A protein has these predicted regions:
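PRPP-associated nucleotide enzymes
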Residues: 1-125, 130-217
Length: 217
């Protein structure tokens, strides 16, 4: 396993972002592990998270100029931390996020931060994709930005699950919207990491059994 993947998984566990047990995903699926960016609670943690996103960005997009979009609520801090980390490494990109409730006073509007203009490209910063529900919601919001184009989505963990069909949720998103989805790690990296310690046998078995039913074909 690559060193940065191991470091990232250890970071997720240490911060309480990656947990094992019985959970319900946004898609309604009962899942044996949960990735919750809402557990990031300190300056050090969000700084570190931003660095992992920035590494993924540079690895996949290089120095490409784009606007970062963080879907409310968890994507807000993720997109800001990614923008800060990119800036520290020589790439200054704008960011914005949506309001859950549209504001009808003050400056008003659906978005907070930089609002992309026609011809500009957008990168979505999300935490995780299970069935692709959240990304589809984001695309419904972003379609009102005439002349802009989403070119990629970055997530923490690819769960490698089927979406609305037997295909992987990420593959479905890529085919439906025409942009790639990149992850720092995927569930098989997590399994490989867990298998190094026999104490994790139960969690490994539960995840493998879950993937046998819900994994992408």
């Amino acid at each position: 396993m690559e060193a940065y993947k191991r470091e990232f998984i250890e970071f997720l566990q240490g911060a309480g972002v990656l947990k094992f047990g019985d959970f319900t995903a946004k898609s309604g699926r009962k899942i044996p592990y949960f990735v919750n960016a809402g557990m990031i609670k300190t300056g050090d943690q969000i700084t570190k998270m931003g660095e992992f996103y920035a590494k993924a960005y540079f690895d996949k997009l290089g120095k490409k100029q784009a606007v970062l979009y963080g879907p409310a609520y968890k994507g807000i801090s993720l997109s800001i931390s990614a923008a800060v980390a990119l800036s520290k490494n020589g790439l200054n990109v704008p960011f914005f996020f949506n309001r859950k409730e549209v504001k009808d006073h003050g400056e008003g509007g659906t978005f907070v931060g930089y609002v992309p203009q026609a011809g500009e490209e957008i990168v979505i910063i999300e935490d995780v994709i299970t069935a692709g529900t959240a990304i589809r919601e984001s695309m419904e919001i972003l379609k009102h930005l005439d002349g802009t184009k989403v070119i990629a989505t970055f997530i923490m963990v690819d769960r490698k699950e089927k979406g609305q069909t037997e295909k992987g949720a990420m593959q479905e998103i890529e085919e439906q919207f025409g942009f790639p989805v990149y992850s720092v790690v995927d569930v098989y990296d997590i399994i490989e990491y867990l298998e190094e310690d026999p104490a994790n046998e139960e969690n490994v078995t539960r995840i493998k059994n879950y993937l046998a039913v819900n994994g992408a074909k």
